[in-house]
Amino acid sequence: MADTPTSRMIHPFSNIPSQNLKQFQYSDNPQHPCHPYRAPSDTHVVPHHYGLKSHSPDAGYESQATPNKYTLDSSEGAGCMRHDSPSSQSFTTRSGSPLSQEDSHSDSTDGSPVGASCVTEDPNDLKQKLKDLEAVMLGPDSEIVNSLENSVANQLSLEPEKWVRMMGIPRGNLKELLIACARAVEEKNSFAIDMMIPELRKIVSVSGEPLERLGAYMVEGLVARLASSGISIYKALKCKEPKSSDLLSYMHFLYEACPYFKFGYMSANGAIAEAVKGEDRIHIIDFHISQGAQWISLLQALAARPGGPPTVRITGIDDSVSAYARGGGLELVGRRLSHIASLCKVPFEFHPLAISGSKVEAAHLGVIPGEALAVNFTLELHHIPDESVSTANHRDRLLRMVKSLSPKVLTLVEMESNTNTAPFPQRFAETLDYYTAIFESIDLTLPRDDRERINMEQHCLAREIVNLIACEGEERAERYEPFGKWKARLTMAGFRPSPLSSLVNATIRTLLQSYSDNYKLAERDGALYLGWKSRPLVVSSAWH
């Protein structure tokens, strides 16, 4: 079985499985940050699955199940995934109406006759006197007050579906309803939220059409955002983690279903092979080595080089949280790659560096003069905090540091999306558009009611979606940027583009022949884009 990659945060192209949709349990373990696969230190933290629980002091959402679909549950007392009652669900508010009129109390304490008469007079007479008093105090505005009160009462009596239609959203238009709900969350419009969440719950389903499946996780992200902010969000989203062997199985499941990882690996390896052609000593620095899968094909290619293979040294960087998916530390990666190199008769050395990418300094890398240096960032640099998160701006610092090492090539593979600094409504809409394409591409390959597919989407894609929607500041680990922004950063760091060769382009086109015709390959601005239909999803580029 082919080796497969892992992911820190679980970007769209990796997976975290689950054996049982009922296994969600809540935890307030303070060791887990908002980013579920990143620890604040290098201490090993076993990652957890995430379900949802509302911590809102104003209204806790209860889940109500109806038949025939897998659904998500955000109740406080139940697990967030319900399989025993497969269906769409709706929310009700335990606190009742989101709007309530304040009671006004007027106490008379001065012993006046009015105060005495309040006790002794006929109740009907008392009511009339109070109305007369109200008329004097409110004057002509009393009719306005009554009108407003009646309007609120009428609104509250509306069923959510009717209220949504009054907003001009066509019945069943999930995309528009999701965007409207996100806008209501941004505006803190609790009444609109309480109307739209139940209606959304009737439409979304983790076993439905692509947009319905995605919508289930988008709603969970909105609920998590409402529940709290920052690190406490993911305290409400923790669930048990499967054993590492199951984890790897699900990673392989998605790796084979979609070509995104293979595209990234093949394009980066092709650029590296071109850049180090004729070199006798090669040093590759991989800022997210994961399982080391990317380098197997490159070692095989270097072994076939005319005149014999070069000496290869790989520095593998990965923080300790990835050890769970591997079932051990970086030494497992080193042993595996050493075995492959031995079979290929390639002189090989592995240098493990168990540290967060944002903490890497030049002194950690052991660069030796005379080596041809290649630096690889595959679906990793968007995890590195930039200037919008911290004045340290490790994203640009790393690029400047790498440039100071004079590499032959830097390879960058990233998601083509703009969610880093966009305001929340735009970020939500971009996330919806991007992941719609991802879920559609999966839908063409795997049955909708396939349990492995449901688990894969739930425990991989869902946690990234929730992070994008629910978290802010340092807790929002998923910070994608479009290629234009990466190009500007690399240029400012002193890099120049190295267009990918026609051979790389042709090799990837051959790969895509095994997949749907809806996958599109395009080359522009010196970069190679892989997309679904008209939506670019992943972009690969090389720099020197």
Curated annotation (Swiss-Prot):
One of its GO terms (biological process) is regulation of DNA-templated transcription. Residues 373-467 are annotated as: PFYRE. Coiled coil: none annotated. Signal peptide: none annotated. InterPro entries: TF_GRAS. Residues 332-364 are annotated as: Leucine repeat II (LRII). GO terms for cellular component: nucleus. It holds the Pfam family GRAS. GO terms for molecular function: DNA-binding transcription factor activity; sequence-specific DNA binding. Residues 251-316 are annotated as: VHIID. Residues 15-30, 63-74, 86-101 have a biased composition (Polar residues). It comes from the Eukaryota. Residues 470-544 are annotated as: SAW. Induction by oligosaccharide elicitor is independent of de novo protein synthesis. This is Chitin-inducible gibberellin-responsive protein 2. The gene is CIGR2.
